Amino acid sequence: MSLKVPKANNLQLFKDGYKHLSGLEDAVLRNIQAVSELSDLVRTSFGPNGRNKLLINHLGKLFVTSDAATIIREVEVVHPAAKLLVMASQAQEVEMGDATNTVIILAGELLKKAEHLLIMGLHPSEITRGYELACKKGLEELEKLSKSSLPTPLTQDSLATALKPAIASKQYGFEDTLSSLVAEAALAVMPPNPKNFNVDNVRVVKIMGGSLAGSRVVRGMVFGREPEGMIKKVNKAKVAVFTCALDIAQTETKGTVLIHNKEEMLNFTAGEEKHLEKVRPVVCSLAPEMLRTMQIFQEIADSGVKVVIAGSTVGELALHFLNRLGIAVLKVLSKFDLRRLCRVVNATPLARVGAPTAEEAGYVDVFESIEIGGDRVTVVRQLVESDEGFDPTDKSAEKTRTATIVLRGATSNLLDDLERAVDDGVNVIKALLKDGRLVPGAGATELELAKRVDVYGSGLKGLSQHAVRRWATALEVVPRTLAENALGGSEGNEVVSRLWAKHEQDGGEVFGVDVEAESDGTLSAVDHKILDSLAAKSWAIRLATEAAVSVLSVDSIIMSKPAGGPKIPQQAGNWDDDD
Protein backbone atom coordinates (compact mmCIF):
# COMPACT_ATOMS: atom_id res chain seq x y z
CA MET A 1 0.00 0.00 0.00
CA SER A 2 1.47 3.33 -1.08
CA LEU A 3 1.49 6.34 1.17
CA LYS A 4 1.03 9.93 0.04
CA VAL A 5 3.95 12.09 1.06
CA PRO A 6 2.71 15.53 2.18
CA LYS A 7 4.20 18.65 0.60
CA ALA A 8 6.53 20.80 2.61
CA ASN A 9 4.85 23.92 3.89
CA ASN A 10 7.82 26.13 3.09
CA LEU A 11 8.13 25.06 -0.56
CA GLN A 12 8.20 28.27 -2.62
CA LEU A 13 7.87 27.59 -6.36
CA PHE A 14 6.34 30.89 -7.55
CA LYS A 15 6.72 34.50 -6.51
CA ASP A 16 4.29 36.02 -4.04
CA GLY A 17 0.92 36.80 -5.58
CA TYR A 18 0.76 33.84 -7.98
CA LYS A 19 -2.43 31.76 -8.09
CA HIS A 20 -2.15 28.09 -8.91
CA LEU A 21 -5.34 26.05 -9.39
CA SER A 22 -5.15 22.41 -10.35
CA GLY A 23 -7.20 19.25 -10.19
CA LEU A 24 -10.65 18.30 -11.39
CA GLU A 25 -12.60 20.47 -8.98
CA ASP A 26 -10.53 23.65 -9.08
CA ALA A 27 -9.44 23.79 -12.72
CA VAL A 28 -11.53 21.65 -15.09
CA LEU A 29 -14.99 21.99 -13.56
CA ARG A 30 -14.46 25.68 -12.83
CA ASN A 31 -13.53 26.28 -16.47
CA ILE A 32 -16.62 24.39 -17.60
CA GLN A 33 -18.77 26.53 -15.30
CA ALA A 34 -17.36 29.76 -16.78
CA VAL A 35 -17.92 28.57 -20.34
CA SER A 36 -21.47 27.47 -19.48
CA GLU A 37 -22.30 30.94 -18.16
CA LEU A 38 -21.10 32.54 -21.41
CA SER A 39 -23.05 29.99 -23.43
CA ASP A 40 -26.24 30.62 -21.43
CA LEU A 41 -25.78 34.38 -21.90
CA VAL A 42 -26.02 34.24 -25.71
CA ARG A 43 -28.28 31.19 -25.96
CA THR A 44 -31.45 33.25 -25.50
CA SER A 45 -30.39 35.41 -28.48
CA PHE A 46 -30.20 32.44 -30.86
CA GLY A 47 -32.50 32.13 -33.86
CA PRO A 48 -35.20 34.34 -35.39
CA ASN A 49 -37.02 34.71 -32.06
CA GLY A 50 -33.86 35.38 -30.06
CA ARG A 51 -34.06 38.13 -27.46
CA ASN A 52 -32.07 41.34 -27.71
CA LYS A 53 -29.41 42.29 -25.20
CA LEU A 54 -29.01 45.88 -24.05
CA LEU A 55 -25.29 46.53 -23.60
CA ILE A 56 -23.40 49.60 -22.43
CA ASN A 57 -19.67 49.32 -23.03
CA HIS A 58 -16.81 50.99 -21.13
CA LEU A 59 -17.19 54.13 -23.26
CA GLY A 60 -20.89 54.47 -22.47
CA LYS A 61 -22.01 53.48 -25.96
CA LEU A 62 -25.40 51.77 -26.08
CA PHE A 63 -26.01 48.56 -28.06
CA VAL A 64 -29.36 46.82 -28.56
CA THR A 65 -28.66 43.64 -30.49
CA SER A 66 -29.06 39.87 -30.66
CA ASP A 67 -25.86 39.44 -32.67
CA ALA A 68 -23.58 37.10 -30.70
CA ALA A 69 -20.40 38.50 -32.25
CA THR A 70 -21.29 42.01 -31.04
CA ILE A 71 -22.38 40.80 -27.59
CA ILE A 72 -19.17 38.92 -26.77
CA ARG A 73 -17.03 41.71 -28.21
CA GLU A 74 -18.62 44.38 -26.01
CA VAL A 75 -18.95 42.46 -22.71
CA GLU A 76 -15.12 42.12 -22.50
CA VAL A 77 -14.79 38.53 -21.29
CA VAL A 78 -11.77 38.12 -18.97
CA HIS A 79 -11.97 34.47 -17.88
CA PRO A 80 -9.22 32.56 -19.75
CA ALA A 81 -11.37 29.50 -20.52
CA ALA A 82 -14.29 31.61 -21.76
CA LYS A 83 -11.84 33.56 -23.92
CA LEU A 84 -11.13 30.35 -25.84
CA LEU A 85 -14.79 30.30 -26.89
CA VAL A 86 -14.65 33.98 -27.78
CA MET A 87 -11.66 33.36 -30.05
CA ALA A 88 -13.43 30.40 -31.70
CA SER A 89 -16.52 32.49 -32.43
CA GLN A 90 -14.36 35.33 -33.76
CA ALA A 91 -12.66 32.86 -36.11
CA GLN A 92 -16.11 31.80 -37.34
CA GLU A 93 -17.09 35.45 -37.83
CA VAL A 94 -13.98 36.16 -39.91
CA GLU A 95 -14.22 32.99 -41.99
CA MET A 96 -17.97 32.72 -42.60
CA GLY A 97 -19.73 35.75 -41.14
CA ASP A 98 -22.53 33.53 -39.80
CA ALA A 99 -23.18 30.87 -37.12
CA THR A 100 -21.09 32.62 -34.45
CA ASN A 101 -23.77 31.94 -31.85
CA THR A 102 -23.87 28.28 -32.89
CA VAL A 103 -20.18 27.92 -32.03
CA ILE A 104 -20.67 29.28 -28.51
CA ILE A 105 -23.82 27.38 -27.53
CA LEU A 106 -22.58 24.12 -29.08
CA ALA A 107 -19.20 24.35 -27.32
CA GLY A 108 -20.96 25.18 -24.05
CA GLU A 109 -23.29 22.19 -24.42
CA LEU A 110 -20.37 19.88 -25.25
CA LEU A 111 -18.65 20.92 -22.03
CA LYS A 112 -21.84 20.48 -19.99
CA LYS A 113 -22.12 16.90 -21.29
CA ALA A 114 -18.43 16.34 -20.55
CA GLU A 115 -18.97 17.51 -16.96
CA HIS A 116 -21.29 14.55 -16.28
CA LEU A 117 -18.73 12.13 -17.70
CA LEU A 118 -15.94 13.65 -15.59
CA ILE A 119 -18.00 13.34 -12.40
CA MET A 120 -18.76 9.71 -13.32
CA GLY A 121 -15.01 9.05 -13.42
CA LEU A 122 -14.00 9.21 -17.09
CA HIS A 123 -10.56 10.64 -17.76
CA PRO A 124 -10.45 13.87 -19.81
CA SER A 125 -8.26 12.17 -22.44
CA GLU A 126 -11.01 9.59 -23.10
CA ILE A 127 -13.56 12.38 -23.53
CA THR A 128 -11.37 14.40 -25.90
CA ARG A 129 -10.64 11.28 -27.97
CA GLY A 130 -14.36 10.53 -28.21
CA TYR A 131 -15.20 14.12 -29.16
CA GLU A 132 -12.59 14.09 -31.92
CA LEU A 133 -13.94 10.81 -33.31
CA ALA A 134 -17.50 12.13 -33.19
CA CYS A 135 -16.52 15.40 -34.90
CA LYS A 136 -14.79 13.51 -37.71
CA LYS A 137 -17.82 11.26 -38.22
CA GLY A 138 -20.23 14.20 -38.01
CA LEU A 139 -18.39 16.15 -40.71
CA GLU A 140 -18.41 13.07 -42.96
CA GLU A 141 -22.17 12.69 -42.54
CA LEU A 142 -22.68 16.43 -43.05
CA GLU A 143 -21.32 16.11 -46.60
CA LYS A 144 -24.08 13.58 -47.36
CA LEU A 145 -26.88 15.89 -46.18
CA SER A 146 -26.42 18.49 -48.93
CA LYS A 147 -29.78 18.80 -50.70
CA SER A 148 -29.02 21.55 -53.23
CA SER A 149 -26.48 24.20 -54.15
CA LEU A 150 -26.44 27.81 -55.27
CA PRO A 151 -27.71 27.85 -58.88
CA THR A 152 -25.72 29.28 -61.77
CA PRO A 153 -25.97 31.76 -63.35
CA LEU A 154 -26.65 33.84 -60.27
CA THR A 155 -29.92 35.75 -60.05
CA GLN A 156 -31.20 38.19 -57.48
CA ASP A 157 -33.99 35.81 -56.42
CA SER A 158 -31.67 32.83 -55.94
CA LEU A 159 -29.19 34.88 -53.91
CA ALA A 160 -31.95 36.42 -51.78
CA THR A 161 -33.42 32.97 -51.05
CA ALA A 162 -30.05 31.66 -49.89
CA LEU A 163 -29.54 34.74 -47.67
CA LYS A 164 -32.90 34.77 -45.90
CA PRO A 165 -32.14 32.25 -43.13
CA ALA A 166 -28.92 34.04 -42.13
CA ILE A 167 -30.55 37.48 -42.10
CA ALA A 168 -33.76 36.23 -40.42
CA SER A 169 -31.71 35.14 -37.40
CA LYS A 170 -30.65 38.80 -36.94
CA GLN A 171 -33.68 40.77 -38.20
CA TYR A 172 -36.73 38.52 -38.17
CA GLY A 173 -39.55 40.10 -40.16
CA PHE A 174 -37.21 42.23 -42.28
CA GLU A 175 -35.44 39.32 -43.99
CA ASP A 176 -37.29 39.71 -47.30
CA THR A 177 -36.37 43.39 -47.70
CA LEU A 178 -32.79 43.07 -46.46
CA SER A 179 -31.97 39.93 -48.44
CA SER A 180 -33.26 41.57 -51.63
CA LEU A 181 -31.13 44.68 -50.99
CA VAL A 182 -27.99 42.65 -50.26
CA ALA A 183 -28.52 40.41 -53.30
CA GLU A 184 -29.03 43.43 -55.59
CA ALA A 185 -25.89 45.13 -54.26
CA ALA A 186 -23.82 41.94 -54.54
CA LEU A 187 -24.87 41.34 -58.15
CA ALA A 188 -24.03 44.95 -59.02
CA VAL A 189 -20.39 44.41 -58.00
CA MET A 190 -20.06 40.75 -59.01
CA PRO A 191 -16.80 40.18 -60.93
CA PRO A 192 -16.63 37.88 -64.00
CA ASN A 193 -15.24 35.16 -61.72
CA PRO A 194 -17.64 35.07 -58.72
CA LYS A 195 -14.99 33.48 -56.48
CA ASN A 196 -13.12 36.81 -56.58
CA PHE A 197 -16.10 38.62 -54.98
CA ASN A 198 -14.82 41.31 -52.60
CA VAL A 199 -17.05 42.12 -49.62
CA ASP A 200 -15.39 45.54 -49.37
CA ASN A 201 -17.13 46.62 -52.59
CA VAL A 202 -20.54 46.60 -50.85
CA ARG A 203 -20.82 49.58 -48.53
CA VAL A 204 -23.54 50.75 -46.11
CA VAL A 205 -24.70 54.32 -45.46
CA LYS A 206 -27.18 54.97 -42.65
CA ILE A 207 -29.61 57.88 -42.93
CA MET A 208 -31.86 58.59 -39.96
CA GLY A 209 -35.58 58.87 -40.59
CA GLY A 210 -38.21 56.98 -42.53
CA SER A 211 -38.51 53.21 -42.42
CA LEU A 212 -36.66 50.24 -43.82
CA ALA A 213 -39.02 50.26 -46.82
CA GLY A 214 -37.32 53.48 -47.94
CA SER A 215 -33.91 51.80 -48.20
CA ARG A 216 -32.36 51.43 -51.63
CA VAL A 217 -29.22 50.33 -53.47
CA VAL A 218 -27.12 52.98 -55.20
CA ARG A 219 -24.45 51.90 -57.66
CA GLY A 220 -21.26 53.65 -56.66
CA MET A 221 -19.94 55.08 -53.41
CA VAL A 222 -22.35 57.18 -51.38
CA PHE A 223 -21.19 59.71 -48.80
CA GLY A 224 -23.63 61.09 -46.25
CA ARG A 225 -22.76 64.72 -47.00
CA GLU A 226 -22.99 67.04 -49.99
CA PRO A 227 -20.02 68.66 -51.78
CA GLU A 228 -18.37 71.57 -50.00
CA GLY A 229 -18.49 74.05 -52.88
CA MET A 230 -21.09 75.26 -55.35
CA ILE A 231 -20.32 72.61 -57.99
CA LYS A 232 -22.75 69.74 -57.33
CA LYS A 233 -22.52 67.61 -60.49
CA VAL A 234 -19.66 66.67 -62.82
CA ASN A 235 -19.56 64.02 -65.55
CA LYS A 236 -16.49 62.27 -66.98
CA ALA A 237 -13.90 64.16 -64.97
CA LYS A 238 -10.35 63.75 -63.71
CA VAL A 239 -10.07 63.35 -59.94
CA ALA A 240 -7.34 64.43 -57.53
CA VAL A 241 -7.26 62.95 -54.01
CA PHE A 242 -5.42 64.83 -51.25
CA THR A 243 -4.82 63.49 -47.74
CA CYS A 244 -3.57 66.86 -46.47
CA ALA A 245 -5.50 70.04 -45.66
CA LEU A 246 -6.46 72.33 -48.53
CA ASP A 247 -5.49 75.55 -46.80
CA ILE A 248 -2.71 78.11 -46.45
CA ALA A 249 0.17 76.70 -44.45
CA GLN A 250 0.80 78.78 -41.35
CA THR A 251 3.54 78.32 -38.76
CA GLU A 252 2.72 78.01 -35.10
CA THR A 253 5.30 80.68 -34.17
CA LYS A 254 4.36 84.33 -33.76
CA GLY A 255 4.95 86.60 -36.74
CA THR A 256 6.36 89.51 -34.67
CA VAL A 257 9.09 91.58 -36.34
CA LEU A 258 11.28 94.11 -34.49
CA ILE A 259 12.15 97.12 -36.71
CA HIS A 260 14.68 99.69 -35.52
CA ASN A 261 14.78 102.24 -38.35
CA LYS A 262 13.14 103.28 -41.61
CA GLU A 263 15.61 101.33 -43.78
CA GLU A 264 14.63 98.05 -42.14
CA MET A 265 10.95 98.84 -42.70
CA LEU A 266 11.55 99.53 -46.43
CA ASN A 267 13.61 96.35 -46.84
CA PHE A 268 10.95 94.24 -45.05
CA THR A 269 8.35 94.83 -47.77
CA ALA A 270 10.75 95.02 -50.70
CA GLY A 271 10.77 91.26 -51.27
CA GLU A 272 6.99 91.04 -51.51
CA GLU A 273 6.85 94.05 -53.85
CA LYS A 274 9.40 92.52 -56.22
CA HIS A 275 7.39 89.25 -56.24
CA LEU A 276 4.16 91.07 -57.00
CA GLU A 277 5.77 93.01 -59.86
CA LYS A 278 6.35 89.72 -61.73
CA VAL A 279 2.70 88.56 -61.76
CA ARG A 280 -0.26 89.73 -63.79
CA PRO A 281 -1.78 93.12 -62.91
CA VAL A 282 -5.14 91.41 -62.20
CA VAL A 283 -3.79 89.76 -59.07
CA CYS A 284 -1.36 92.45 -57.97
CA SER A 285 -3.72 93.50 -55.22
CA LEU A 286 -3.73 90.03 -53.62
CA ALA A 287 -1.78 89.22 -50.49
CA PRO A 288 1.20 86.87 -51.02
CA GLU A 289 -0.56 83.94 -49.29
CA MET A 290 -3.66 84.37 -51.45
CA LEU A 291 -1.51 84.64 -54.54
CA ARG A 292 0.33 81.41 -53.79
CA THR A 293 -2.96 79.64 -53.10
CA MET A 294 -4.47 80.82 -56.36
CA GLN A 295 -1.40 79.75 -58.32
CA ILE A 296 -1.53 76.25 -56.81
CA PHE A 297 -5.20 75.71 -57.64
CA GLN A 298 -4.76 77.24 -61.07
CA GLU A 299 -2.12 74.57 -61.74
CA ILE A 300 -4.56 71.89 -60.55
CA ALA A 301 -7.26 73.24 -62.89
CA ASP A 302 -4.80 73.46 -65.80
CA SER A 303 -4.01 69.75 -65.37
CA GLY A 304 -7.66 68.96 -66.22
CA VAL A 305 -8.86 68.07 -62.71
CA LYS A 306 -12.58 68.75 -62.19
CA VAL A 307 -13.12 66.92 -58.87
CA VAL A 308 -11.01 67.28 -55.72
CA ILE A 309 -11.36 64.85 -52.79
CA ALA A 310 -10.01 66.24 -49.51
CA GLY A 311 -9.06 63.95 -46.64
CA SER A 312 -8.78 66.84 -44.20
CA THR A 313 -10.02 70.40 -43.79
CA VAL A 314 -10.82 72.71 -46.69
CA GLY A 315 -9.97 76.36 -46.05
CA GLU A 316 -12.32 79.18 -47.01
CA LEU A 317 -9.78 80.72 -49.36
CA ALA A 318 -9.09 77.37 -51.05
CA LEU A 319 -12.82 76.76 -51.44
CA HIS A 320 -13.25 80.24 -52.95
CA PHE A 321 -10.65 79.61 -55.64
CA LEU A 322 -11.93 76.09 -56.37
CA ASN A 323 -15.43 77.48 -56.90
CA ARG A 324 -14.09 80.16 -59.24
CA LEU A 325 -12.24 77.50 -61.24
CA GLY A 326 -15.33 75.25 -61.50
CA ILE A 327 -13.86 72.36 -59.47
CA ALA A 328 -16.13 70.22 -57.26
CA VAL A 329 -14.87 69.54 -53.73
CA LEU A 330 -15.82 66.64 -51.43
CA LYS A 331 -14.47 66.18 -47.92
CA VAL A 332 -13.98 62.52 -46.86
CA LEU A 333 -12.70 62.27 -43.28
CA SER A 334 -12.58 58.46 -43.01
CA LYS A 335 -9.21 57.09 -44.08
CA PHE A 336 -10.89 53.78 -44.94
CA ASP A 337 -13.44 55.45 -47.22
CA LEU A 338 -10.65 57.52 -48.76
CA ARG A 339 -8.74 54.33 -49.54
CA ARG A 340 -11.81 52.71 -51.12
CA LEU A 341 -12.53 55.84 -53.13
CA CYS A 342 -8.98 55.82 -54.49
CA ARG A 343 -9.58 52.26 -55.66
CA VAL A 344 -12.88 53.19 -57.32
CA VAL A 345 -11.48 56.18 -59.25
CA ASN A 346 -8.02 54.61 -59.70
CA ALA A 347 -6.22 57.58 -58.11
CA THR A 348 -3.13 57.94 -55.94
CA PRO A 349 -3.63 59.86 -52.67
CA LEU A 350 -1.32 62.87 -52.48
CA ALA A 351 0.19 64.22 -49.26
CA ARG A 352 0.98 67.63 -50.79
CA VAL A 353 -1.27 70.18 -52.48
CA GLY A 354 -0.37 70.53 -56.14
CA ALA A 355 -1.22 69.43 -59.64
CA PRO A 356 -1.29 65.61 -59.92
CA THR A 357 0.62 63.81 -62.64
CA ALA A 358 -1.17 61.68 -65.23
CA GLU A 359 -0.44 58.55 -63.17
CA GLU A 360 -1.63 60.12 -59.90
CA ALA A 361 -4.93 61.51 -61.20
CA GLY A 362 -8.04 59.34 -61.20
CA TYR A 363 -11.16 59.34 -63.33
CA VAL A 364 -14.86 59.21 -62.52
CA ASP A 365 -17.85 58.95 -64.84
CA VAL A 366 -20.46 60.50 -62.53
CA PHE A 367 -20.02 62.80 -59.52
CA GLU A 368 -23.34 64.16 -58.31
CA SER A 369 -25.31 65.22 -55.27
CA ILE A 370 -28.75 63.65 -54.90
CA GLU A 371 -31.50 63.78 -52.28
CA ILE A 372 -32.53 60.69 -50.31
CA GLY A 373 -35.34 61.12 -47.82
CA GLY A 374 -34.75 64.83 -47.41
CA ASP A 375 -30.98 64.46 -46.88
CA ARG A 376 -28.40 65.42 -49.49
CA VAL A 377 -25.77 62.77 -50.26
CA THR A 378 -22.94 62.59 -52.78
CA VAL A 379 -22.61 59.71 -55.24
CA VAL A 380 -19.34 58.80 -56.96
CA ARG A 381 -19.68 56.02 -59.52
CA GLN A 382 -18.41 54.54 -62.74
CA LEU A 383 -20.78 53.67 -65.58
CA VAL A 384 -21.40 49.98 -66.33
CA GLU A 385 -22.69 48.23 -69.44
CA SER A 386 -26.37 48.68 -68.52
CA ASP A 387 -26.06 52.46 -67.92
CA GLU A 388 -26.99 55.07 -70.49
CA GLY A 389 -23.93 56.77 -71.93
CA PHE A 390 -21.57 53.86 -71.29
CA ASP A 391 -18.69 53.85 -73.77
CA PRO A 392 -17.03 50.40 -74.10
CA THR A 393 -14.07 51.95 -75.94
CA ASP A 394 -13.31 54.39 -73.11
CA LYS A 395 -10.16 53.12 -71.39
CA SER A 396 -9.43 56.29 -69.44
CA ALA A 397 -9.61 54.50 -66.12
CA GLU A 398 -9.73 51.05 -64.67
CA LYS A 399 -13.36 50.47 -63.69
CA THR A 400 -13.94 49.26 -60.15
CA ARG A 401 -17.54 48.43 -59.32
CA THR A 402 -18.95 49.57 -56.00
CA ALA A 403 -22.47 49.48 -54.61
CA THR A 404 -23.85 51.19 -51.52
CA ILE A 405 -26.90 50.11 -49.53
CA VAL A 406 -28.63 53.21 -48.14
CA LEU A 407 -30.45 52.14 -44.97
CA ARG A 408 -33.32 54.15 -43.47
CA GLY A 409 -34.55 53.74 -39.92
CA ALA A 410 -36.12 55.58 -37.01
CA THR A 411 -33.29 55.23 -34.47
CA SER A 412 -29.52 54.95 -34.59
CA ASN A 413 -29.58 51.66 -32.65
CA LEU A 414 -31.91 50.11 -35.23
CA LEU A 415 -29.70 51.33 -38.07
CA ASP A 416 -26.61 49.85 -36.39
CA ASP A 417 -28.35 46.49 -36.00
CA LEU A 418 -29.55 46.56 -39.62
CA GLU A 419 -25.99 47.29 -40.72
CA ARG A 420 -24.71 44.26 -38.80
CA ALA A 421 -27.34 42.08 -40.51
CA VAL A 422 -26.28 43.42 -43.93
CA ASP A 423 -22.61 42.73 -43.16
CA ASP A 424 -23.47 39.15 -42.19
CA GLY A 425 -25.46 38.73 -45.40
CA VAL A 426 -22.58 39.96 -47.57
CA ASN A 427 -20.17 37.57 -45.82
CA VAL A 428 -22.59 34.68 -46.36
CA ILE A 429 -22.62 35.47 -50.09
CA LYS A 430 -18.83 35.32 -50.15
CA ALA A 431 -18.89 31.93 -48.39
CA LEU A 432 -21.58 30.57 -50.74
CA LEU A 433 -19.64 31.67 -53.82
CA LYS A 434 -16.69 29.59 -52.64
CA ASP A 435 -18.80 26.57 -51.65
CA GLY A 436 -22.41 26.74 -52.84
CA ARG A 437 -23.66 23.56 -51.19
CA LEU A 438 -26.73 23.99 -48.97
CA VAL A 439 -28.13 21.83 -46.17
CA PRO A 440 -31.55 21.94 -44.46
CA GLY A 441 -31.79 24.63 -41.79
CA ALA A 442 -34.16 25.17 -38.84
CA GLY A 443 -32.17 22.65 -36.76
CA ALA A 444 -32.90 19.75 -39.14
CA THR A 445 -29.26 19.10 -40.04
CA GLU A 446 -28.06 19.08 -36.41
CA LEU A 447 -30.80 16.65 -35.35
CA GLU A 448 -30.04 14.28 -38.23
CA LEU A 449 -26.32 14.41 -37.42
CA ALA A 450 -27.13 13.65 -33.78
CA LYS A 451 -29.08 10.56 -34.86
CA ARG A 452 -26.35 9.25 -37.17
CA VAL A 453 -23.43 9.92 -34.81
CA ASP A 454 -25.33 8.26 -31.95
CA VAL A 455 -25.70 5.11 -34.07
CA TYR A 456 -21.99 5.28 -34.85
CA GLY A 457 -21.11 5.65 -31.16
CA SER A 458 -23.24 2.65 -30.19
CA GLY A 459 -21.04 0.43 -32.36
CA LEU A 460 -17.75 1.55 -30.80
CA LYS A 461 -15.87 -0.33 -28.12
CA GLY A 462 -14.16 1.17 -25.14
CA LEU A 463 -14.85 4.20 -23.00
CA SER A 464 -14.73 6.61 -25.96
CA GLN A 465 -18.22 5.52 -27.02
CA HIS A 466 -19.70 7.42 -24.06
CA ALA A 467 -18.10 10.67 -25.23
CA VAL A 468 -19.20 10.05 -28.83
CA ARG A 469 -22.81 9.58 -27.80
CA ARG A 470 -22.65 12.65 -25.53
CA TRP A 471 -21.32 14.65 -28.50
CA ALA A 472 -24.34 13.51 -30.52
CA THR A 473 -26.70 14.48 -27.71
CA ALA A 474 -25.11 17.93 -27.50
CA LEU A 475 -26.09 18.68 -31.12
CA GLU A 476 -29.71 18.60 -30.03
CA VAL A 477 -29.15 21.98 -28.36
CA VAL A 478 -29.61 23.79 -31.71
CA PRO A 479 -33.22 22.70 -32.50
CA ARG A 480 -34.09 22.75 -28.80
CA THR A 481 -32.93 26.36 -28.42
CA LEU A 482 -34.79 27.41 -31.57
CA ALA A 483 -37.99 25.84 -30.22
CA GLU A 484 -37.60 27.22 -26.69
CA ASN A 485 -36.93 30.77 -27.87
CA ALA A 486 -39.91 30.66 -30.25
CA LEU A 487 -42.49 28.66 -28.31
CA GLY A 488 -41.38 28.46 -24.69
CA GLY A 489 -39.74 25.75 -22.62
CA SER A 490 -42.50 23.13 -22.27
CA GLU A 491 -43.75 23.48 -25.84
CA GLY A 492 -40.16 23.42 -27.07
CA ASN A 493 -39.58 20.00 -25.50
CA GLU A 494 -42.67 18.63 -27.23
CA VAL A 495 -41.51 20.00 -30.59
CA VAL A 496 -38.11 18.30 -30.20
CA SER A 497 -39.87 15.01 -29.39
CA ARG A 498 -41.99 15.30 -32.55
CA LEU A 499 -38.87 16.07 -34.57
CA TRP A 500 -37.15 12.91 -33.29
CA ALA A 501 -40.17 10.89 -34.36
CA LYS A 502 -40.13 12.39 -37.86
CA HIS A 503 -36.37 11.91 -38.26
CA GLU A 504 -36.84 8.18 -37.64
CA GLN A 505 -39.01 8.01 -40.78
CA ASP A 506 -37.78 7.81 -44.37
CA GLY A 507 -37.05 11.30 -45.73
CA GLY A 508 -37.38 12.81 -42.27
CA GLU A 509 -33.92 14.39 -42.30
CA VAL A 510 -35.36 17.61 -43.79
CA PHE A 511 -37.71 18.37 -40.87
CA GLY A 512 -36.85 21.24 -38.57
CA VAL A 513 -38.42 23.68 -36.12
CA ASP A 514 -41.31 25.87 -37.26
CA VAL A 515 -40.78 29.11 -35.32
CA GLU A 516 -44.18 30.41 -36.43
CA ALA A 517 -45.93 27.27 -35.09
CA GLU A 518 -48.41 26.97 -37.93
CA SER A 519 -49.17 23.32 -37.13
CA ASP A 520 -47.29 21.02 -34.75
CA GLY A 521 -44.13 23.13 -34.56
CA THR A 522 -42.31 21.20 -37.30
CA LEU A 523 -41.83 21.86 -41.00
CA SER A 524 -39.89 20.67 -44.01
CA ALA A 525 -36.92 23.01 -44.28
CA VAL A 526 -36.42 22.16 -47.96
CA ASP A 527 -40.05 22.88 -48.91
CA HIS A 528 -39.95 26.22 -47.06
CA LYS A 529 -36.52 27.04 -48.59
CA ILE A 530 -34.82 27.33 -45.20
CA LEU A 531 -31.32 26.31 -46.25
CA ASP A 532 -27.99 27.00 -44.58
CA SER A 533 -24.46 26.99 -45.94
CA LEU A 534 -22.78 23.62 -45.56
CA ALA A 535 -19.39 25.29 -45.16
CA ALA A 536 -20.66 27.49 -42.31
CA LYS A 537 -22.11 24.45 -40.48
CA SER A 538 -18.87 22.54 -40.99
CA TRP A 539 -16.74 25.35 -39.60
CA ALA A 540 -19.07 25.88 -36.64
CA ILE A 541 -19.02 22.20 -35.63
CA ARG A 542 -15.24 21.97 -36.04
CA LEU A 543 -14.49 25.16 -34.09
CA ALA A 544 -16.94 24.32 -31.28
CA THR A 545 -15.41 20.87 -30.86
CA GLU A 546 -11.86 22.24 -30.90
CA ALA A 547 -12.75 24.85 -28.29
CA ALA A 548 -14.37 22.23 -26.04
CA VAL A 549 -11.36 19.90 -26.40
CA SER A 550 -8.99 22.78 -25.57
CA VAL A 551 -10.87 23.54 -22.35
CA LEU A 552 -10.96 19.85 -21.36
CA SER A 553 -7.22 19.53 -21.97
CA VAL A 554 -6.45 22.07 -19.25
CA ASP A 555 -5.62 20.57 -15.85
CA SER A 556 -3.98 23.54 -14.19
CA ILE A 557 -4.42 27.33 -14.11
CA ILE A 558 -1.44 29.51 -13.20
CA MET A 559 -2.06 33.24 -12.88
CA SER A 560 0.65 35.76 -12.07
CA LYS A 561 0.17 38.76 -9.84
CA PRO A 562 -1.09 41.77 -11.82
CA ALA A 563 1.45 44.52 -12.38
CA GLY A 564 1.49 47.19 -9.70
CA GLY A 565 0.21 50.71 -10.03
CA PRO A 566 -3.16 52.02 -11.11
CA LYS A 567 -4.73 50.31 -14.09
CA ILE A 568 -4.47 52.30 -17.31
CA PRO A 569 -7.98 53.09 -18.57
CA GLN A 570 -8.83 51.71 -21.98
CA GLN A 571 -8.61 54.45 -24.57
CA ALA A 572 -11.43 55.22 -26.95
CA GLY A 573 -9.16 55.24 -30.00
CA ASN A 574 -9.86 56.99 -33.24
CA TRP A 575 -13.52 57.15 -34.32
CA ASP A 576 -12.55 55.66 -37.68
CA ASP A 577 -10.63 52.59 -36.44
CA ASP A 578 -13.63 50.23 -36.26
CA ASP A 579 -14.77 50.80 -39.84
Language model region names:
Residues 2-70, 75, 135-406, 410, ...:
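Extended amphipathic alpha-helical scaffolds
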